[in-house]
Each structure stands twice: as C-alpha cells, then as structure tokens.
C-alpha cells in the first residue's frame, strides 16, 4: 500500500455521515473518527500540493498520525448520531493507536425500591428493572452493599423477598413482620420514607446509628455495638464531603476532566435530591501529550456511563467545559432514554462551583496518583523495546500440562502497578502441543476484545514462534496491542533450566534481546512471567486431581486404559465425555462401553 493508493482512496469518499479508519503500512489501525460529511472531514487532514502530506494546520497529534497513514476505510451511516455510537464501539473494541481508551468496563450498583410490592424493600441492581413503579438511588461507586446493610440495621424493614411467617429478623427486632400483618402498610411506608431520607442524607443515618450504638453499649451488648460502630466508620468513608448548598431538591450529574504530566483524570458526581450521594474518579495514563483530545474523552466517558441497560435518573448533565459533540450527545441520550436530556456548561452559581470542585478534585487525583505510583519501568520498556503503547495494562499468558494430560492455559493481568486478580482467566485446552495450546488461548482472549477491551501489551511465555503467533492473532483482530515474549536460553536446541543458570531472553517484533540479570526491565518481565506460571501450575494441579478422580470412576466401570485414552484424545476432558451423545460414544468405543458411561 502506498501514498498513491491513499490519494485514490480519498477521491472515493462520499458526502455523507459515517465513520472513517486510518491504517499504517502493516495494516494496524491507527485511528477511528466520525464525520458529518466524510469527504470534507477526511480530506481536511491532508494537503494535496505539491504532493499528498499532512495538513500543517492540524495538531501535532493529527500530523504524526497522517504521516503513518497509507490506507483508509469508511462506513457510511444514516445519521451523525449513529456514526458517533459506531465510532465509540470501534474505539472500545479495537483500541486504535491514536484514540484514547478509557478502561472501565464495570457496571456500578443502584439501590432501588419496587413500589408495586405491598411492603417494598431495598434491593440492589446493576441494570434496569423492567417494572413500572421502581425508584432508583445511585449509582454507588463503592459500598452499596454495606450502605444497604446499615439501612437494614437501623430501619426494621422487610429484608427477604418472600416470607410467609415471622423470621429470624423479627426475633432480633430487625423486622416488624409485615408478612404476618403485624404492621399496617401505611405505618410501614412511613418507616420506608424515613429510610429513603437517610439514604439520601448520610448524616441523618450516621446520627441514628450513633444513637443505636450508644444504647447497645449502655445495655452491655458490646458485640452488636461493635457492628454498628463498623457501619458508622464505613458510611463516613463513603460520604462525599462537599460544602456547597444546592437550593433545589433536584437530580443531576457532573463530569470533569483534568490532564497533567501525561495522566488523564476523570471525575463524576451523582446528585440526587440536592445531595451528592456518590463520586467516582478514574486515572488513565496517556501514551504521550500530543494524544490529549478533550472532545473524544467526553464522548467516551458519557456514552460509557449511560449505556442502554442502566438507569439514567437525571435529566441534566453538567460538564466543566464545552466540547465539540455536546449537542449530538444530547440527541443520542434523549433517544436512548426516551426523555429530554440536556448537557450544560454552567456559567455562574452553585452548579458552576460544583463543576469547578469536580475539576479541582480531578487535578488533585493526578497529584495523588503520581505520588503513589512510579511509572518509570513502563516508560523504560516502551523506549527500549520501541513499543507503541505505554504498557500500563499488561496481559501475561502461560500454558501447563503433563505429557498431554490436564491441558490448561492461564492469563494474569497487571494494571497500573498492581495485579488485577478480577481479570485473571483460566482455560481448559483441547490441544497437546505448546504452539496449538497458545493459539487456542490467545484466540479465545482475542474473541473477547468486544467485551473486555484489549490491553497495552501481551507478554507470552515462549520464544519467537509464539511471538509470531501472537502477532498473527493481533493483526487479524485489528487491535493495537504490543507483544513481547520471554523464553529460556537454548543450549543444544533445548531450553537451559539448570538451577542458577537459566538465562532469559526477550523477543520483540524488533528482534531478540539478552539483558543483564540485574536489569530492572528484565526483572520486571520475569516477575510478570513467574506470576502467570504460578497461576497456570496451580490450575493444572487442581485440574489433574479432578481428572484423576474422574479417571478412577471410569476405571471402576470396567473401561480399559486404552478406551479412556481414546475418549480423552477425542473429547479433551472428562466433562465432555460425560456430556457426549450416546450415538457418538458408540461409534468411538462401542455400544457396551457407551452404555456404561451414560448409565453412570
């Protein structure tokens, strides 16, 4: 592909809305953007005389991107709103080099009350509840379950979904047994209203709990008093302390961004009934300063926080500053939630002060992050191995088996200087050789890029062959992920693993590297590899134990070791053998053996 091809592609652009994609010489996706008019927007990136080159009027970030571009593709859409949604989806799934990806695939819990019930109770959800009389509170970015427990600790409301007679909560004075009509609905709803008021005003809940703790202590019920004390400490930790009075009892959201020293900080306040009930902050290291794009980040931040399957309680979203696609986002959210949603930039008054406060806190979070975390090693890796991404989000892969038995793979995740164990994954594998096993693991991970965004770096436990395999999978996925592999030095074509003499080599797409055993970069990569190895070995051992147990069960049925090996070779694991169709088993090992398996 050449610049001449690119010039011809520019001539084919239509005068319609859509999404465009830029690719480099290797076919890697560089950037995804949306346009009201594809022809005008894309051509604005270029100057055409004396020959095709980057338009010098654009930012350094855009000029650098265009210098790398040799190919473009586009998708026409029916509207600019459709284009924006598609653009956001591509960024999340494909992780283009010059787009910023906000890594937050979490959904946060809401507390809700279903007023269709005769005696409503507090419940937790992460999605819309399809009922007509639902009242939501939140989202709560931390401590939703603990907050709910505190409410139930003080207010004697129904806790069980269904109860036909007084339960343990009634016996310990934590419920008034509405199931047995020991309280009227009117009186019950009065208590519920008090609890809702406390939910929206944590200071009220704190005062009530402090009174309860004092009474319990005076009655020498120290164990229960200690529980209440712990609840008080938790709520104080959750409470958002903002000394700004909001005159109206209204609901709205606030978003602010801050950028400093190659770190992006985002902050969200949730205001309900005139009170800031929760706040969420996120830190995202940016590859370099020229990739800061305020409009792109606001779009991504707001669309990801208000997806179609979660509640949007407020009708107004306030942002710290203006951004290009604000009005378009209003249109998308209004259509998505079937009500008028406004995104505003307040100029004066309490809303302006809250937006300023959000921005100041976003800046403070950057300073706090930089004091707590040292990104030196990531910067050294990026520079030394000529990586495209700053490797803050790393996935490390390893496989484990014993002579083709209990074949498993493992992935561990290292994110912003700590292990993210919630993202660890285990794989049961069909193949028996290392190459095909790694292909299976990496392919399965790549197929999930639409659900769990790709990392900055893949680290493979293996040599150049597995590095090339990983490259093949990444290229076919169209995502922007760097790749490194780490392997033992080979002597006489065998990996040298003698204790004290095992030397590691690092493989990258730029070549092979032998680093000193005292090199911090090597030690860091070894630490990552060792954790993946530990996790894979542990999973292998547990799998082997289970397979040995199941193997003994098959042996007890009178099946020979030859039959069992044949079954395992075909089905891969014992679970699949037991689930296999009788007809397939019969064809493989005969009717008699098949009957024994299915009958037991």
Curated annotation (Swiss-Prot):
Signal peptide: none annotated. GO terms for cellular component: cytoplasm; excinuclease repair complex. Residues 15-100 form the GIY-YIG domain. The keyword Transferase does not apply. The keyword Iron-sulfur does not apply. GO terms for molecular function: DNA binding; excinuclease ABC activity. Residues 203-238 form the UVR domain. GO terms for biological process: nucleotide-excision repair; SOS response. Keywords: Cytoplasm, DNA damage, DNA excision, DNA repair, Excision nuclease, SOS response. Gene3D superfamilies: GIY-YIG endonuclease, UVR domain, UvrC, RNAse H endonuclease domain. It holds the Pfam family UvrC_RNaseH. It is found in: Cytoplasm. Interacts with UvrB in an incision complex. HAMAP family: UvrC (MF_00203). The UvrABC repair system catalyzes the recognition and processing of DNA lesions. UvrC both incises the 5' and 3' sides of the lesion. The N-terminal half is responsible for the 3' incision and the C-terminal half is responsible for the 5' incision. Belongs to the UvrC family. This is UvrABC system protein C. The gene is uvrC.
């Amino acid at each position: 592909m050449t610049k001449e091809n690119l010039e011809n592609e520019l001539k084919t652009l239509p005068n319609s809305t859509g999404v465009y994609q830029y690719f480099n010489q290797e076919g890697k996706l560089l950037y995804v953007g949306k346009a009201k008019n594809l022809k005008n927007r894309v051509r604005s990136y270029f100057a055409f005389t004396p020959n095709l080159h980057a338009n010098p009027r654009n930012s350094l970030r855009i000029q650098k991107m265009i210098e790398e571009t040799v190919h473009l593709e586009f998708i026409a859409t029916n509207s600019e709103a459709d284009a924006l949604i598609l653009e956001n989806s591509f960024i999340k799934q494909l992780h283009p080099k010059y787009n910023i990806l906000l890594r937050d695939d979490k959904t946060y819990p809401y507390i809700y009350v279903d007023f269709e019930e005769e005696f409503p109770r507090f419940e937790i959800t992460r999605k819309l509840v399809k009922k007509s009389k639902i009242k939501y509170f939140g989202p709560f970015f931390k401590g939703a379950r603990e907050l709910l427990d505190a409410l139930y600790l003080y207010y004697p409301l129904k806790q069980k979904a269904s109860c036909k007679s007084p339960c343990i909560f009634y016996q310990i004075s934590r419920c008034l047994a509405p199931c047995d009509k020991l309280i009227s609905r009117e009186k019950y709803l009065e208590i519920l209203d008090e609890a809702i008021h406390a939910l929206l005003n944590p200071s009220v809940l704190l005062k009530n709990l402090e009174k309860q703790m004092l009474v319990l202590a005076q009655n020498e019920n120290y164990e229960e008093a200690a529980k209440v004390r712990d609840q008080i400490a938790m709520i104080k930790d959750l409470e958002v302390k903002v000394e700004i009075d909001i005159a109206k009892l209204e609901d709205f959201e606030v978003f602010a961004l801050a950028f400093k020293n190659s770190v992006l900080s985002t902050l969200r306040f949730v205001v309900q009934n005139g009170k800031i009930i929760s706040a969420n902050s996120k830190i995202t290291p940016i590859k370099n300063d020229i990739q800061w794009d305020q409009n792109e980040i606001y779009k991504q931040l707001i669309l990801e926080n208000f997806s179609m399957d979660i509640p949007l309680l407020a009708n107004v979203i306030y942002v710290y500053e203006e951004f290009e696609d604000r009005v378009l986002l209003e249109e998308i959210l209004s259509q998505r939630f079937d009500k008028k949603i406004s995104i505003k930039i307040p100029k004066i008054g309490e809303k302006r002060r809250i937006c300023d406060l959000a921005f100041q806190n976003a800046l403070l979070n950057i300073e706090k992050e930089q004091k707590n975390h040292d990104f030196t090693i990531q910067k050294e890796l990026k520079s030394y191995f000529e990586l495209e991404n700053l490797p803050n989000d790393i996935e490390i892969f390893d496989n484990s088996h014993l002579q083709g038995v209990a074949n498993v793979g493992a992935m561990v995740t290292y994110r912003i200087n700590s292990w993210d164990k919630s993202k660890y994954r285990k794989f049961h594998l069909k193949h028996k050789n290392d190459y095909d096993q790694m292909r299976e693991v990496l392919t399965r991970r790549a197929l999930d890029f639409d659900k769990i965004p790709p990392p900055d770096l893949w680290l493979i436990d293996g040599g150049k062959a597995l590095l090339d395999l990983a490259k093949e999978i990444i290229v076919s996925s169209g995502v922007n992920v760097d790749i490194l592999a780490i392997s033992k030095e080979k002597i006489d074509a065998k990996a040298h693993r003698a204790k004290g003499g095992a030397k590691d080599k690092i493989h990258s797409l730029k070549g092979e590297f032998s680093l000193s055993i005292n090199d911090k970069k090597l030690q860091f990569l070894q630490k990552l590899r060792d954790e993946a190895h530990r996790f894979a070995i542990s999973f292998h051992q547990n799998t082997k134990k289970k397979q040995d147990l199941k193997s003994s069960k098959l042996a007890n049925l009178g099946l020979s070791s030859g039959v069992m090996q044949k079954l395992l070779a075909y089905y891969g694991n014992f679970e699949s053998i037991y689930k296999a169709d009788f007809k397939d088993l019969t064809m493989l090992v005969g009717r008699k053996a098949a009957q024994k398996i299915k009958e037991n």
